């Protein structure tokens, strides 16, 4: 006989000894049970038991999921640790009540469920089975069948955003796995290509990064500790798998030992096979990238950037690692700081993903408690090992994992979204943070940016190109040189793309998929141009690749492969040991066909910094006319030989990237000498290459006010850049940087009416500048707005300014305006209706109410007027809005009307909205629910509508429940 019990705390008499069964039923979201739908949802369902001393076995619709302990005759209790069991695809019945049954054995009756009740989790949602269950003693199993009709008790169907803390399961779910040979045989290659496995498990596990030292040896980073940091306890998390932990980890050797490691592999006899395999550092935690340089190895070991000294190069650290940086976030361990790589300028560059934040400090330099450099979300950072300067290089991007400098020093990354093959980063660039959801990705770091620079458009591209590189190796096909190659772990292939110039950046066009593998566990996550001219591919080798699945312990930490890809007809380079070469031998390598040789030569020359080499490099740069000159410039800079005289001369160099890098390298000093500044200003006036002009703008952002604004003024007069994807935004960022403390200097530029007439200013600057001043909202800012209006030469320019002014005031009441601005506003020929409303014009208010109710008018105009009328508290607005919400069909207008109605407190409004709820368009119902939840009196009508069935429970989100609970009293009691 089944009887009711409460889980986790059973009622009296329901703690029997011996064997028995608990059961309940659950109806899951349809996509959890839809085979042939999106695999991620079906494959990401797990069941968790927090703690139970009893031996137990878990069954779903009669199918065993797992268990702990053992039953008589050899009975053993569970270890009381939390358990997670995978729900296999097909185990859940769509649209039915699935039977969850747990067989238990309690020797003494003390083994009831502890902590919380069992729970079932999908990728983003979960359901907690705390409450009523059924219990039956004995060993006879329940029917093991899903029900069509909801059972009378112990039935659960309320799911909410997943937030229960996660942990690493004792048993991991690996999924299908082929041997290295079997997987290799499944590759499909474009004609003329060859691929081979150079390393595989157990020598390689979970590889996320590949690098090479000056001897051409391969360094591999094994991110085996992922996804859980060693020794830390998760105390909370959100549905995006961002977690908080109980403490900040210390750097090695004071950390909790983990499973990640760094290894080095060498091909001694030159036959292409790695003969020696050494572990350089092990027992690491969140170590995802290792990079040789400066007589040691740099390891990105979040939250620290570590340096392991190894001056004698014996592959044994000389001592404990030095923490050069601290404070990188690890809330989401698939978004941590990563991808460290040497820039051509001698800086160490790294990336940060989309769902972590950082507050970076420099141990030993910054005082205890220093604020550090804070940033939330994706960005590119850099650090100089000699000066120990740290800065954010570019803001935004995708969930960046890996960085790539091409042959001209451009910086790229992949993207874990669609529509692009990646991002092209320029200095001081500001890009979209992965997506526009501030709840997931954080708000814009600069609220006055009013825009961002785009990713490289590529048409209809499915997500995603996790990692991209610019192919540049002599053993690769000639047609591939300089093209982007993307690693797509979701689709088990590599994609080759052509870059098409688009002003200062690019669009991309896919050429094809030259490398495919039908093995579902092939997951390419990183690629590198190798010293021998081939290409190496790091394969994470996982059946399950989504990070949420990894947090669910669907991961294989024992697998991993590395492949070599090359053209069949191309020989590999044998001379890959540059360590013993003299400076005289390294300089000619600056024109080597392999990027690795060129960049390694630059790095070695820079680290040696021999004074005698400086003159030779100056001569090299002057003598060369192409890319070899650029590499010479980088080397000259790194040895300390790029002075103003040399840089000024290079502004005339025929290769545009030499000109751009001369500006950038001197600009890194954050102030230019008077002579060099004047030379750059003249360059800005005449420069014909958009990437050089883009770099001038990027450098200007870093410079003092007069130099910055002087360069921006020249660039704003270059009509050719009006449609450029980068330069207009860069110019705006130069101006915006000085609006706060040097407003007068910015406005002085616009005392010249000819600047208004420049297409760059007309299209990209005027509206933003007016909006920036008005949004800041101080009296001096409004006086600045008046000056802009006064100096504007035409009505069209004033219209541009007023568009920015109106945007700045959206969502707020009009503040007191200075007389100077009021005078200019009165002089406007035909001020916009929305502005007249905000100024309190009674005739305009009446006209606005008519427009608001006119369905034939553009929805955008009506929404603006609703907001403006609400902000000024227009008379008659309540009645107009009430009529609107009862008749309107446009979702945007209706949602704006409901939001504006919240300022009025009449109970009749709640009655009207609740009564009309069924007639609202589905897309507007969240706004209606938010309206009803906003006031206690209306909340009672919301709860009554739910109780009567007129409003579906699923329409009330967890966030809304939290609002209801905040009202307290009877509303809170009913909500709970």
Model feature map: region roles:
Residues 19-25, 44-46, 82-84, 97-99, ...:
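Intrinsic-disorder/low-complexity, polar/charged segments enriched in Ser/Thr/Lys/Arg/Asp/Glu/Gln
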Residues 2-4, 13-17, 842:
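Edge strands and adjacent loops of beta-rich recognition modules
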Residues 160-587, 595, 602, 606-619, ...:
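Beta-propeller blade termini and top-face loops
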Residues 538, 552-560, 565-976:
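Long, ordered, helix-rich scaffold segments
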Residues 11-15, 24-25, 36, 72-74, ...:
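Beta-strand-rich interaction surfaces with strong enrichment in secreted/lumenal proteins
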Residues 2, 18, 26-28, 32-65, ...:
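Aromatic-lined ligand-binding clefts that engage carbohydrates, nucleic acids, or primary amines
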Residues 7-10, 59-85:
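Solvent-exposed beta-strand/loop surfaces of large extracellular or lumenal domains
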Residues 1, 70, 80-165:
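An acidic-aromatic loop/edge-strand motif
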């Amino acid at each position: 006989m089944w009887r009711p019990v409460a889980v986790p705390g059973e009622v009296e008499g329901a703690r029997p000894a011996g064997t028995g069964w608990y059961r309940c039923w659950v109806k899951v979201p349809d996509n959890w049970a839809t085979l042939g739908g999106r695999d991620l949802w079906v494959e990401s369902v797990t069941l968790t038991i927090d703690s139970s001393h009893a031996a137990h076995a878990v069954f779903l619709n009669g199918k065993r999921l797992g268990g702990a302990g053992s039953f008589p005759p050899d009975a053993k209790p569970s270890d009381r640790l939390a358990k997670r069991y995978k729900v296999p695809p097909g185990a859940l019945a769509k649209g039915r009540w699935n039977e969850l049954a747990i067989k238990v054995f309690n020797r003494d009756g003390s083994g009831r469920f502890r902590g919380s009740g069992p729970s079932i989790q999908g990728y983003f949602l979960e359901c907690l089975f705390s409450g009523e269950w059924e219990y039956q003693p004995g060993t006879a199993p329940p029917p093991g069948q899903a029900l069509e009709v909801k059972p009378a008790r112990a039935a659960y169907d309320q799911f909410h955003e997943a937030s229960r803390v996660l942990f690493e399961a004792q048993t991991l779910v690996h999924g299908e796995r082929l041997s290295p040979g079997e997987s290799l045989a499944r590759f499909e290659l474009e004609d003329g290509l060859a691929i081979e496995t150079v390393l595989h498990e157990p020598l390689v596990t979970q590889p996320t990064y590949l690098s090479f030292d000056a001897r051409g040896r391969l360094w591999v980073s094994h991110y085996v500790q992922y996804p859980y940091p060693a020794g830390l306890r998760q105390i909370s998390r959100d549905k995006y798998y961002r977690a908080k932990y109980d403490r900040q980890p210390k750097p090695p050797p004071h950390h909790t030992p983990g499973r990640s490691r760094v290894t080095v592999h060498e091909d001694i006899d030159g036959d292409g096979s790695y003969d020696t395999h050494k572990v350089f550092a092990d027992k690491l935690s969140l170590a995802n990238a290792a990079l040789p340089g400066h007589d040691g190895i740099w390891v990105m070991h979040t939250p620290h950037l570590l340096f392991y000294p190894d001056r004698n190069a014996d592959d044994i650290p000389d001592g404990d690692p030095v923490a050069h940086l601290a404070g990188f976030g690890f809330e989401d361990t698939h978004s941590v700081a990563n991808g460290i790589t040497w820039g051509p300028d001698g800086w160490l560059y790294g990336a940060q993903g989309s769902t972590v934040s950082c507050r970076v400090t420099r141990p030993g330099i910054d005082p205890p408690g220093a604020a550090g450099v804070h940033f939330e979300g994706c960005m590119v950072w850099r650090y100089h090992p000699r000066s120990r300067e740290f800065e954010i290089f570019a803001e935004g991007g995708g969930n960046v994992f890996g960085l790539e400098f091409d042959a001209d020093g451009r910086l790229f990354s992949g993207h874990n979204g669609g529509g692009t093959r990646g991002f092209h980063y320029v200095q001081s660039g500001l890009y979209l943070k992965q997506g526009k959801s501030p709840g997931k990705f954080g708000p814009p770091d600069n609220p006055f940016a009013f825009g961002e620079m785009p990713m490289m458009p590529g048409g209809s591209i499915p997500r995603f190109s996790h990692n991209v590189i610019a192919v540049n190796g002599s053993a690769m096909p000639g047609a591939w040189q300089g093209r982007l190659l993307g690693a797509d772990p979701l689709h088990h292939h590599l994609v080759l793309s052509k870059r098409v110039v688009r002003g200062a950046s690019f669009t991309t066009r896919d050429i094809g998929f030259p490398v495919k593998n039908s093995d579902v566990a092939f997951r390419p996550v990183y690629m590198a141009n190798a010293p021998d001219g081939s290409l190496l591919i790091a394969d994470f080798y996982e059946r399950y690749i989504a990070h949420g699945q990894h947090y669910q312990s669907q991961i294989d930490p024992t697998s991993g492969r590395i492949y070599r890809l090359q053209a069949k007809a191309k020989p590999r380079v044998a001379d890959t040991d540059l360590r013993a070469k003299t400076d005289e031998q390294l300089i000619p390598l600056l024109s080597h066909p392999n990027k690795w040789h060129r960049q390694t030569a630059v790095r070695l020359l820079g680290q040696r910094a021999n004074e005698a080499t400086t003159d030779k490099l100056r001569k090299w740069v002057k003598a060369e006319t192409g890319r070899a000159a650029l590499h010479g410039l980088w080397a000259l800079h790194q040895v300390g030989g790029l002075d103003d005289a040399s840089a000024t001369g290079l502004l005339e160099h025929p290769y545009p990237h030499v000109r751009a890098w001369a500006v950038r390298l001197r600009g890194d000093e954050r102030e230019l000498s008077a002579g060099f500044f004047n030379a750059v200003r003249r360059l800005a006036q005449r420069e014909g290459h958009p990437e050089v002009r883009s770099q001038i703008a990027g450098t200007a952002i870093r410079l003092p006010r007069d130099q910055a604004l002087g360069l921006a003024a020249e660039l704003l007069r270059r009509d050719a850049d009006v449609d450029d994807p980068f330069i207009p935004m860069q110019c705006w960022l130069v101006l915006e940087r000085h609006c706060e403390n040097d407003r007068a200097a910015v406005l002085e530029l616009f005392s010249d009416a000819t600047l208004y007439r420049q297409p760059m200013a007309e299209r990209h600057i005027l509206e933003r500048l007016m909006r920036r001043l008005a949004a800041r909202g101080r009296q001096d800012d409004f006086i600045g707005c008046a000056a802009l209006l006064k100096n504007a030469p035409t009505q069209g320019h004033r219209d541009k300014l007023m568009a920015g002014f109106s945007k700045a005031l959206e969502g707020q009441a009009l503040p007191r305006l200075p007389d100077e601005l009021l005078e200019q506003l009165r002089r406007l020929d035909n001020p916009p209706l929305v502005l007249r409303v905000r100024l309190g014009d009674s005739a305009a208010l009446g006209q606005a109410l008519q427009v608001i109710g006119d369905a034939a008018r553009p929805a955008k105009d009506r929404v603006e007027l609703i907001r403006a009328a609400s902000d000024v508290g227009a008379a008659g607005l309540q009645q107009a809005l009430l009529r609107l919400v009862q008749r309107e069909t446009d979702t945007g207008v209706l949602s704006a009307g409901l939001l504006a109605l919240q300022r009025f407190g009449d109970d009749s409004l709640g009655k009207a909205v609740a009564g009309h709820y069924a007639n609202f368009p589905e897309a507007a119902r969240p706004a209606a629910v938010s309206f009803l939840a906003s006031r206690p009196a209306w909340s009672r009508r919301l709860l009554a509508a739910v109780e009567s069935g007129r409003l579906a429970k699923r329409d009330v989100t967890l966030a809304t429940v939290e609002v209801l609970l905040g009202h307290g009293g009877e509303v809170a009691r009913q909500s709970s």
